[in-house]
Amino acid sequence: MKLKSFLLASVVAMTLAGCQTTSEKQTAKSVANVPLGVPLAPNYRNEIEIARYSELLLSPEINNDQKAELFLRRGRLYDSVGLSTLARIDFNRAVQLKPDLASVYNFLGIHHTLTQDFGKAYEMFDAVLELDEDHQYAYLNRGIALYYGGRPELSSQDLEAFLARSPADAYRVMWVYLAQAKVDANAAYEQLKANSQALNPDEWSTQLVQLYLGQLTETQFLAQITEGVAGQQQYAERLCEAYFYLVLIDNIYFNIIILK
């Protein structure tokens, strides 16, 4: 399962919970205009992979390091089919068998973020970077945890470090903006405009930045949502992204109005 997809599904849930304090009228305005997708069919391949890893874990011929890797892989698959409790059990088993497996701490940190146990989440992401300082997604994940944990200044630092590793990634640009907007909305807008210069205008994700910059209206943004879509899976992911960022932009603008 793609890490970006897992992260997006995770933070969408957190954002929706947080947006309940925002004007219902504003939120409904955006959501009502989002196109609907066809429900995705279950991914039976993942279920088959889970069964295969379960059989391998019963083998007496594998050592603890190999078991840890298998628990990590099966845990990720459990996450992909929505079995988060089983995923956490496997991740914890992997840590017990191989305490220096950085990726496991990364996923545990995500789970702690989802349960809003931010202190534990920070510890997990710190552990990732102690074991592997080049693990770039730990900067993203810790930045997201800090963002939802109410520490936007520290969040900005992590997300800027994540952006520096790929300045042409619109999603990274967006997360830097979201964190900076919590500190200084006007400065964040100017930085978003500057960071957008490195983006490819032909990438759909760039339209997210254009939406936030006011270069696209919401109607124009939604009208182009199907362009270049290769299949139902990609369409579902794009709808999820559109919903997520539309809710956030309404929340940001609402907060700016309140502050004024």
Task: Specify the residue positions occupied by each region the protein language model found.
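Canonical tetratricopeptide repeat
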Residues: R73, N106-F107, N141, W175
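Helix-start (N-cap) detector for alpha-helical repeat units in TPR-like alpha-solenoids
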Residues: N64-A68, A102-S103, Q136-Y137, D169-Y171, ...
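Register position in tetratricopeptide repeats
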Residues: S80, L114-T115, Y148-G149, K182-D184, ...
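N-terminal leader/linker segments that initiate helical-solenoid repeat arrays
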Residues: C19-R73
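Structural marker of alpha-solenoid helical repeat scaffolds
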Residues: S59, N63, L97, L131, ...
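Hydrophobic/aromatic packing residues within the alpha-helices of TPR/SEL1-like helical repeat arrays
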Residues: Y53-S54, F91, F125, L159
